[in-house]
């Protein structure tokens, strides 16, 4: 059983090798090499893409941290001012100038507009409106027992506001706006008549209304953005503000206004070393504020669909990146600003950068390697194909007689032995026909060897056309042929032999110009049915002996037994 299994495995391998062939194996090898080279290149592309994304995030993080530090500085100043205001409300300074300011307030509080100023060089003036105007506002009120303390606290905060406000800061204006009808601002009010307009401009802003106890229950710092009206000459601003409370009473709002243009200038300064990519600042509602590219302010602005896609991505993380068409968009939420900083990197910018150069080089290398691989495949494939054709031709020549195109003696014996063994295994008959052309030497002597060759070729064609599909014929001598008939009984083999004899004898063939001859053959037939012997050489010897009996009996005959 083990021997049979081993033989079956070897037979299966041989069939597979014949089915595939050298050309298919070459194709398979080159496909595997191309596949692995493509996978390695793809892996390098993935690593390169990860490095590119990390680089984009690092650039964005550096700018975001720098912007956050400046904004944090302003928020810290705002918290410091609120703490100072609270202390001043609880324990005001007992200065004569401050008491005089309270007295002056009592004298002018009924006036339409008023201004209290201690020392213009050291502190900021308090600008206010009348009691009547205050009573008209829903959020405004002077029904406060600590109103005098708030007046003095506002003057003290005015001193701190003057110190905190400087030209190097991003803040354009710092102010305290009270619910009691007055305000202190680093931007002076030149004419008293403008105080009511300016005050009501403050108290109607979202950054003031948004700090009511209902709107801002946690009393935290909040950011607001203001977009200019179409008919207004004012520019967009970002305002950070915080409510001022003491003893559960809301006094007013401290705020700082930052023009969007200063943020734009900061972004431009922050990316001087990184020329590629555009930085964009958005508020918490993803409304565009400013860009680091003033020359093309709307070049990379997102449409509503892209903004919705970006907002959906931002819901899951405070930082990240996505691809939009030919752009890579990375974002990071700021810690001290209620908004997000976005970096847009286009495909053209990426191609011009270091990663673009590496990507192009990698693509060219892969294309060059693939081209060389295909050329090598073509050359080797042609070489193997030619060698395979040559091998097949040499093998055919080694197994066949070139004149008759039948098997030669050695090949016939190689074919006969396994066929005889197979028939013996399955108990099928195995027959042999031996054929010899009559008077062939006389034809050679009379008409020449070329005529003899034509006779042999003609006879071989007639013999082949008389056989069954499973029969095998070969040339075993000069004018001798042998036919193997696996599975044919002696009677069937004799019928085949008779058919061969008739075909050979019936047809005339042209030997020379106007010269035709008719050939004949003597045939001997043997079969394993007679003795049970499946030895091919013994059967051939028996058929050969009967062939000579046919010649002795007058030629052009078939002898299938010794007694016929």
Swiss-Prot record:
Signal peptide: none annotated. It catalyses: 2 GTP = 3',3'-c-di-GMP + 2 diphosphate. It is an enzyme of class 2 (transferase). Keywords: Cell inner membrane, Cell membrane, Cellulose biosynthesis, GTP-binding, Magnesium, Membrane, Metal-binding, Nucleotide-binding, Transferase, Transmembrane, Transmembrane helix. The keyword Lipid biosynthesis does not apply. It holds the Pfam family GGDEF. Its main location: membrane. The active site is at 479 (proton acceptor). InterPro entries: CHASE7, Diguanylate_Cyclase, GGDEF_dom, Nucleotide_cyclase, Rev_trsase/Diguanyl_cyclase. Its EC number is 2.7.7.65. Mg(2+) binds at residues 436, 479. Its cofactor is Mg(2+). Substrate binds at residues 444, 449, 453. It comes from the Bacteria. Homodimer. This is Probable diguanylate cyclase DgcQ. It comes from Shigella dysenteriae serotype 1 (strain Sd197).
